[in-house]
Amino acid sequence: MEKGILKSVIAVAAIITSIILITLTLSVCSNNSASFTGDVVATTAATEIKLTDGLGKEVVLDKPAEKILVFAPSALEIIDGLNAMDAVIGIDNWSVDNKEPLAEGFEGFGDFQTLNMEKITAAAPDIIIGLAGCAEADIQKLTDLGIKIYVVDANMIDEVYMEIINMGKILGKDTEARELVDELKKQVEGISSKVAGLTEDKKPKVFYEVWNEPLMSAGKNTFINDLIEKAGGINIVAADGLEGWPEYSIEKLIQNNPDIIIAPVSLAPDVSTIIEDRRFSSINAVVNKKVYVVPDNPTTRPSQNIIKGLTMFAQAIHPEIFGEFSVQQ
C-alpha cells in the first residue's frame, strides 16, 4: 500500500502524509517500481547470504547482519517479532519524533526526504532496511560507498510472508522467521477459510476512505483491497478496475452504494466524522450505521501485525461470522 499512496497523495494535507508515512512506512530507498519477488536465492558459500529485495535487486551479505539501520517501522516490527532488536543500531527520525512504540532508546538517522549521511557512514551499518519511495539520491550515494541496502516493497499479505523470511535470512533467524510465517499463515487462513465459500451476493460492498477532499480510496494491488477480499467483502473501487490509491467521485460512490465504509483513524477520529458528512447521507453504510474507524498501523504496515487489521476488517464486514467489531492496536 505503500509506494502507491506516496505517489498518489504526497501533495495532500499533512494527515495524508501521515498515512503515507505509515502506509509507506518512512522508507529509505529508490522510487523504482520493479515488481516484488522476494526470492531467497541459493547461497554459493556456506556463510554467504543472497536475497532479492522488493525492487528486484540482489543483496549479498557475507554473514548475518549484526548492525542494522531501519528506516521502515514495518521492518522494525518484523525484527521485533524475530526477537532481534539487539541488532538495530538506529532508525528514522519520524519514528523517534512520533514516539513509536519500538523507537524508545534509538537515535534517528534521517528523515523522510533526507538521510543523515555523515551519521550513517560513521555508524558503518552492515545493512540498511527500508521501503520503496524516497531519498533516491542519498541511497545511491550510500550504495556507491558500499553500504548494503535491502528494500521492502510488499503490497499484499502473501508478500509479507517472504519479507519475514528474508528478514530472518538477514539476521540469521531462519527458524524463528519460518515459525512466525507459519503462525501468521494459520491465522490468516483461519479467517479467509470461513468466507471462502460465500457467493458474491453474500459479500457486502465495501468502501475504504483514504481521504475526504478530494475523495480517495484504495483499489487493486493494495493491502486494503487484500484485507477486504480476504475478509469476505467486495471492494467497490477495485471492482471498478481501479488500482493503487485513486480519486473516486462522490457520484460513483452514491451509484455503487456500499454496505460498509471503513476509514483510518488518522482521517476520521470517530465514525461521526463520516456519518455527518452530508455527501454520504443516502449511502446504505451510513443509513444502516455500518461505518467503522480502524487504527492505521495494523491495517497498512506490512508486518506480522497485519493480522490485527484483517481481524478488524472481518468483524466489520461479517460480524455474524467473526463477532462484534473491536479495535485492535
Locations of regions flagged by a protein language model:
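Bacterial Sec-exported substrate-binding components of ABC uptake systems
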Residues: 2-76, 175-207, 257, 316-329
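Structured C-terminal subdomain patch of bacterial secreted/periplasmic proteins
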Residues: 161-162, 166-169, 178, 182, ...
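Flexible loop/hinge segments that line or gate small-molecule binding clefts
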Residues: 95-102, 134-166, 170
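Short helices/loops that flank or line small-molecule/ion binding pockets
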Residues: 115-125, 140, 144-145, 247-257
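Alpha-helical, coiled-coil/dimerization segments enriched in small aliphatic residues
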Residues: 94-97, 217-245
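Short helix-initiation/N-cap motifs at beta->coil->alpha
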Residues: 54-56, 106-118, 240-250
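A short, structured surface patch at a secondary-structure boundary
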Residues: 67-123, 127-132, 233-236
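Extracytoplasmic ligand-binding site segments that recognize negatively charged/polar headgroups
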Residues: 137, 152-166, 201-224, 269
